[in-house]
A protein has these predicted regions:
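Catalytic core of nucleotide-sugar-dependent glycosyltransferases
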Residues: 60-69, 74-101, 114-117, 125-145
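P-loop NTPase catalytic cores that bind/hydrolyze ATP
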Residues: 106-119
């Protein structure tokens, strides 16, 4: 069962097009996409995983992912908080179903990865700074990530953990300055 698997939220991507779901699972649990412009699939996929009676993974690559400059993900500055709303909805539903404690570490790694990924995927400095500061001032604490340790962090989030540690030390402007300095030294 999904809820008994300790890495349930971390076995794949949050994209529905990389998975097949039984219609009965969707119907029985009244699973729907959220009414969001972006990240509307995060809730659907992750709740389907945790509520599934069985999860089967195939070793073959069946889907190729392409990025385009006109995709919703490429233009996430237009709706920069949708991922946050999706994560809150998952957390709240897990608590409502009394499943949160069972999958807490897996959920924290999901939230951690989604937080940092969405921050780093922004292409507008103002949005980056706004999200960066809000992550540090309230969102990390809201998802119980303000004291997230390297031991809790799953290996696939390793590079994101290094970003997180830098974020805890400085403001958005200082972080960006440090990144510019590192690029200068690299060249």
């Amino acid at each position: 069962e999904g809820k008994s698997f300790p890495y349930v939220f971390n076995i794949g991507t949050g994209c529905p097009w990389t998975s097949l779901f039984k219609k009965s699972l969707i119907d029985e649990n009244k699973l729907e996409f959220m009414a969001l412009s972006r990240s509307n699939d995060i809730y659907f996929v992750n709740m389907a995983l945790v509520l599934a009676k069985r999860i089967t993974m195939l070793p073959e690559v069946l889907v190729n992912y392409r990025q385009r400059s006109t995709s919703l993900q490429a233009n996430n500055t237009k709706t920069p908080w949708d991922w946050y709303e999706a994560l809150k909805a998952i957390r709240d539903k897990l608590k409502e179903l009394d499943l949160y404690d069972t999958v807490e570490t897996s959920f924290k790694n999901l939230a951690f990865g989604v937080n940092i990924y969405n921050l780093c995927s922004l292409k507008v400095g103002e949005a980056f700074c706004e999200i960066y500061e809000r992550l540090n001032s309230e969102i990390f604490a809201e998802f119980e990530l303000d004291d997230f340790t390297e031991e809790e962090c799953y290996s696939y989030n390793g590079a994101k953990y290094q970003i997180y540690m830098q974020m805890k030390e400085c403001s958005a402007v200082e972080y960006l300055f440090r990144q510019a300095q590192e690029m200068k030294e690299w060249q």
